[in-house]
Amino acid sequence: MLFKQIRIGKNGVPFTIYKLRTIPEGATIPNAWGAFLRKSKLDELPQLLNVLKGEMTLVGPRPDVPGYADLLQGDDRIILTLKPGITGLASLKYRNEEQLLAQQPNPKQYNDEVIWPDKVRINKWYASNRTFLIDLQIIFYTLVPIPFDVDAF
């Protein structure tokens, strides 16, 4: 029932991230239960194992799949100085990322040209400005999904 995937962690070190499987073996889309798990973000709960292992924190930039972290250049690499988090500012802004991408004629291109660069911008800001209070606010807005402007941080 666990889905494992390699992600890039602090200092660019790969690690195995854990999630609840939302797409049945051999299928290409989630079933109703999987869709519920994704929408509610409950599929992320096994990442508490990653937190206990010291690979992740509760709040921080989401860990990228290999390939994207390699694209970080110059001061963008400040993101890699942090442990990745289960939730973060970019996660909040793009909490409906799947639906947003599904509306695009070329989802990968939209991700690469619009979403990912914006996530880098947000995560750089977080890396330079994070505080305990900001982390508490991020946790609050993760648990209580009310609208707010991430860019107001």
How does the language model describe each region?
Residues 27-90, 139:
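A short, structured surface patch at a secondary-structure boundary
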Residues 115-126:
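Short helix/strand-capping connector loops at secondary-structure junctions
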Residues 1-36, 90-116:
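Short, glycine-rich, amphipathic interfacial segments at transmembrane boundaries or analogous
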Residues 41, 79-81, 103-104, 112-116, ...:
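Short, surface-exposed linear patches
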Residues 65-66, 78-83, 98-104, 123-125:
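Short, charged low-complexity intrinsically disordered segments located at boundaries
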Residues 1-25, 126-153:
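A hydrophobic, helix-centered structural microdomain
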